[in-house]
Regions:
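Charge-rich, low-complexity N-terminal segments
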Residues: 2-6, 12-60
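Soluble non-cytosolic domains of exported or imported proteins
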Residues: 23-27, 90-93, 131-138
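Sec/Tat-exported extracytoplasmic proteins
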Residues: 36-40, 54, 103, 148-155
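A mature extracytoplasmic/lumenal domain signature
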Residues: 44-46, 54, 67-69, 84, ...
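Long, continuous compositionally biased terminal/linker segments
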Residues: 55-83
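Short, highly charged C-terminal tails/helix-capping segments
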Residues: 156-161
Length: 161
């Protein structure tokens, strides 16, 4: 029984967990976004919120770069994400299945369904090393914005995000 408890504790310790952080912005996020030349605002959680304009058909897309990081052993990553669907109603099953099928075709990132209070969201997320350089961060920002916008257009026909 002691071995089972010890194994359970070790397994729990190995699961990815958020790094301890307060609600201030991460200096690494600030530095890399400024180095790239992006303008952004910092939300209440300390995350960087960007509006990516100039997408197809004059569209734009919101995306966030998390200030908090995830730790798995020695590996530290952060999420870059965008919402393509936000509604009081859950995403219909056939559209959720479509997102799951799309996941297999992406080089980076995946779709997940989340609930924020009473609202349901389809969120595209890419995890990058927390200390990723500007070239990598810029590539991921563009991938997140373009993917989020294309799927928002496909799911809703709108440009709300």
């Amino acid at each position: 029984m002691k071995k089972v408890c010890l194994v359970s504790l070790l397994a729990a310790a190995c699961i990815s967990s958020p790094a301890m952080a307060d609600s201030t912005k991460d200096a690494r996020v600030d530095a890399v976004l400024k180095d790239i030349g992006y303008k952004y605002e910092v939300d209440a959680d300390g995350d960087a919120k960007l509006t990516m304009g100039g997408l197809s058909d004059g569209r734009s897309q919101l995306l966030w770069v998390n200030a908090n990081t995830n730790i798995l052993g020695e590996y530290e990553s952060r999420d870059l994400w965008s919402i393509a669907y936000l509604s009081e109603q859950p995403l219909p099953d056939e559209k959720a299945k479509m997102l799951l099928e799309k996941n297999a075709s992406y080089k980076v990132g995946s779709w997940s369904l989340k609930k924020y209070g009473s609202r349901y969201a389809a969120v595209f997320t890419v995890q990058v090393p927390a200390n990723a350089d500007k070239k990598a961060v810029n590539a991921v920002i563009m991938a997140v914005a373009l993917t989020g916008d294309a799927v928002e257009k496909e799911l809703t026909g709108k440009d709300d995000m």
